[in-house]
A protein has these predicted regions:
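Bacterial N-terminal signal peptides that target proteins for export
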Residues: 1-9
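Bacterial N-terminal signal peptides
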Residues: 8-18
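Predominantly soluble domains enriched in secretory-pathway, periplasmic, or organellar proteins
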Residues: 12, 21-348
């Protein structure tokens, strides 16, 4: 893989357009500015992404470009971009449409960042500072989510095609174990405090808790997302609140106790994942079809209260939140955009 350095000027656009919510809430959309961070698309006209990740140690956002075969590393201090190229890609037919598959999963590890590639079913470790690839492993199914588990020094990889999770050694990236489930794995959240990994069964409308050491499923809770099932997931380790992404809303489950549903909030259509800031107890949910970012506060009882709904861009979803509460949103297959969308709170 080759690393290239690019420097783009991010186009900053203030969006104060009111969305169809209550007047007091709509007015608060003006408390955010939205800009685009341009990424090199090599003539493709758009960049398709799934997972992105934020590394608080370096301040970098890592964004795999599936159809480009590159991983973009954005310095959030100045939006400068470095590109790691030459990841494998291939063209496959999905639902009667041809799509390019390539690097899509990403997780921040200990000094390295793990990249999952759907084209060759590889998981590679890349140095978080030099951006040099260190080692790669392969599994015999298409990887989706990739997550580093610090307490066990493992990388867990969801493989929805065969309803499995593959557990890799974080150093060698050799597969240690294969866990098979009754549903299609989707999303992940590590709860180090309770020694659990939370995961959804997208086709069963269930959210599960798995013991990181024994690998046993400890609990299954109704996600109540409906026909589309649950997608992404995040956890507040202090409170035990689990945030579940449904296609048109976000829900809070009490995973610290019995998995009871505590609250939900409408977000607009096109939600795939969500981001949570434990420092401010704020949930951020990008909706790709609705082209908006929902910002909500979570109180000590798990109740969600709307702060703002911010107009973004068609396809903007799967956000990560930085230490400064800036939200970087990935771009999906919807619409055309060669870049990331960034929503920043306006300084008062």
């Amino acid at each position: 893989m080759k690393a290239r350095i690019y420097l783009f000027l991010a186009a900053a656009v203030v969006l104060a357009v009111a969305l169809p919510v209550a007047n007091a809430q709509s007015a608060q959309s003006g408390n955010y500015t939205v800009r685009t961070v341009a990424l090199p698309d090599h003539g493709k006209g758009t960049i398709a992404m799934d997972y992105i990740a934020y590394d608080p140690k370096t301040g970098y956002v890592w964004a795999p470009g599936i159809n480009i075969g590159s991983v973009y590393v954005v310095d959030t201090s100045d939006d400068s971009v470095r590109e790691i190229s030459d990841f494998p890609t291939n063209e496959v037919e999905l639902g009667g449409r041809k799509r390019v598959q390539g690097p899509s999963g990403v997780s921040i590890g200990d000094g390295v960042v793990y990249i999952g590639d759907r084209a060759d079913s590889s998981i590679c470790a890349v140095d978080e500072k030099t951006l040099v690839r260190k080692s790669c492993g392969h599994i015999d199914s298409t990887p989706d989510g990739v997550v580093y588990v610090a307490s066990t020094k493992e990388v867990w990889v969801t493989a929805p095609r065969d309803n499995s999770v593959r557990i890799l050694d974080s150093g060698s990236l050799a597969q240690k174990e294969k866990l098979t489930f009754e549903g299609r794995p989707e999303g992940y959240a590590v709860d180090a405090k309770r020694g659990r990994l939370y995961m959804n069964y997208e086709d069963k409308d269930l959210t599960t808790a798995i013991d990181l050491k024994t690998r046993k499923t400890l609990a299954k809770w109704p996600s109540s997302c409906g026909e589309d099932g649950p997608h992404g997931i995040s956890v507040d380790q202090q409170t035990g609140f689990l945030f579940v992404a449904c296609s048109t809303r976000a829900e809070v489950l009490d995973a610290g106790h019995n998995g009871e549903k505590l609250s939900s909030i409408d977000t607009g259509d096109g939600v795939d994942d969500l981001a949570y800031s434990p420092a401010t107890h704020t949930l951020y949910v990008g909706a790709a079809r609705a082209a908006q970012l929902t910002v909500a506060h979570v109180d000590d009882k798990g109740k969600l209260t709307l702060i703002a709904q911010v107009p973004t861009h068609e396809g903007a979803r799967n956000g990560v939140v930085t230490k400064n509460e800036m939200v970087y949103l990935a771009h999906s297959q919807l619409g055309k955009l060669p870049g990331l969308i960034v929503a920043s709170p306006t300084k008062r």
